[in-house]
From Swiss-Prot:
GO biological process per UniProt: DNA recombination; DNA repair
CDD domains reported for this sequence: TOPRIM_recR
HAMAP family in the cross-refs: RecR
Source species: Vibrio parahaemolyticus serotype O3:K6 (strain RIMD 2210633)
Membership in a protein family: Belongs to the RecR family.
Domain Toprim per the UniProt entry, residue ranges: 81-176
Database matches in Gene3D superfamilies: 3.40.1360.10, 6.10.250.240, RecR Domain 1
Zinc finger (C4-type): 57-72
One Pfam assignment: RecR_HhH
Record-given protein name: Recombination protein RecR
Protein task: May play a role in DNA repair. It seems to be involved in an RecBC-independent recombinational process of DNA repair. It may act with RecF and RecO.
Keyword Metal-binding: yes
Matching SMART domains: TOPRIM
Keyword annotations of the record: DNA damage, DNA recombination, DNA repair, Metal-binding, Zinc, Zinc-finger
Amino acid sequence: MRTSHMLEQLMEALRCLPGVGPKSAQRMAFHLLQRDRKGGLQLADALSQSMTEIGHCAECRTFTEEEVCHICTNPKRQENGQICVVESPADIAAVEATGQYSGRYFVLMGHLSPLDGIGPSDIGLDVLDYRLRRGDISEVILATNPTVEGEATAHYIAELCREHQVEASRIAHGVPVGGELELVDGTTLSHSLLGRHKI
């Protein structure tokens, strides 16, 4: 079936979203045009405004409309001298949801991946190095993903911290709460055994 050029453009644009293939894009486009044109216009307006006005925090690199985000400007967040290094702004939301952390963050917007041509300056480690040199950070909590690239990135940052005499710690990895031991993969179980603590 031949569709209009504009409809094709809409479906192609929707496919830029993660997990949206041709069928899903077609379904979304038809829904917006057939049942929710007002919602479609709101979506278009919000997307347009967000793409032009949301940038990166000058301190932590998370998304914000301001020069410096609300977390970095909060004096209470600066008291303990901690920063938690994460790979994406979505990771900040996950850490914040725990209610267990009250420091500042640094967002890498990725991880080291030499095979893909992603080096230290591509993920802002030059900015992190500058922040460590300023002397207002006493501990860096490494909360990168437990992947090969995430571990390599954490190791690189730990070395940076050593150069600046700043304590570096890694979040624990292990058996999920409610998980069954026999179903846990070997790497996760190894991390759990190595990261055990006294009770």
